[in-house]
UniProtKB/Swiss-Prot annotation:
Protein name as catalogued: Pyrrolidone-carboxylate peptidase
Organism, scientific name: Vibrio parahaemolyticus serotype O3:K6 (strain RIMD 2210633)
GO CC aspect terms: cytosol
Ranges annotated as spanning the membrane: none
Gene3D superfamilies membership: Peptidase C15, pyroglutamyl peptidase I-like
Function as written in the Swiss-Prot or TrEMBL entry: Removes 5-oxoproline from various penultimate amino acid residues except L-proline.
Chief site of localization: cytoplasm
GO terms for biological process, alphabetical: proteolysis
Subcellular localization(s) per the UniProt record: Cytoplasm
Record has Nucleotide-binding as a keyword: no
Gene name tied to this protein: pcp
Annotated EC: 3.4.19.3
Family: Belongs to the peptidase C15 family.
GO MF annotations in UniProt: pyroglutamyl-peptidase activity
Length: 212
């Protein structure tokens, strides 16, 4: 039986909730076809976030890791293609850190690509009625920081990993200026992501790019 670690960030930026954390609470010990989901909570703090996930990886010894964070402004679940080696925080993280144009890993590669079948994920969720599309930018805040840091840690290991952004919850989008997604749909989507990941190592050859 395969084990999938799904991680969720704590609230940040003045929000009382984070849909990533709310989703992983529901997903803990969820059974998959041929697998099980384990979870962990991640601080929205530079470097501490990476350490928390590494600790969980070493404790659970998963086959795959899916790190998850919220993305205000996105209407779909978005598996990320690439993490870049730069921290450029528009706001401070929960530890008060606000690096500008600093590398995450000194002398590290410029970027790491997801090792998950991101296009197959997008295709499968879309066919299941859950909005999903590939994203080509994970930003430069703690989500990208974690994505890059975990990929760096796993660079010589057989554990596959990728980052997935999810929309805000309806209760976070009351101003009417941001799209949202119900927690039930987010949970269903992430469970399906996990199933795709354990079922498929290779991706489908379809367009997932954007003009700009």
């Amino acid at each position: 039986m395969k084990k999938v670690l799904i991680t969720g960030f704590e609230p940040f930026g003045g929000d009382a909730i984070n849909p990533a954390l709310e989703a992983v609470k529901r997903l803990e010990e969820t059974s998959l076809d041929g697998g099980i989901i384990v979870t962990c909570q991640v601080p929205v703090t530079r470097f501490e976030s990476i350490s928390a996930v590494i600790d969980a990886i070493e404790a659970y010894q998963p086959d795959c890791v899916i790190t998850v964070g919220q993305a205000a402004g996105r209407a779909a679940i978005t598996p990320e293609r690439v993490a870049i080696n730069v921290d450029d925080f528009r706001i401070p993280d929960n530890g008060g850190n606000q690096p500008i144009d600093e590398p995450i890993i000194e002398q590290g590669p410029d970027a790491y690509f997801s090792s998950l079948p991101i296009k197959r994920i997008a295709q499968t969720l879309h066919e299941s009625g859950i909005p999903c599309q590939v994203s080509n930018s994970a930003g430069t805040f703690v989500c990208n920081h974690l994505f890059y840091g975990v990929q760096h840690y796993l660079r010589d290991k057989s554990i596959r990993h990728g980052f997935v952004h999810i929309p805000l919850l309806p209760e976070q989008a009351t101003d009417g200026n941001h799209p949202s997604m119900s927690l039930d749909m987010i949970v269903a989507g992430l469970k399906l992501v996990a199933q795709v990941v354990i079922d498929h190592e290779s991706d489908v050859v379809v367009s997932g790019g954007q003009i700009c």
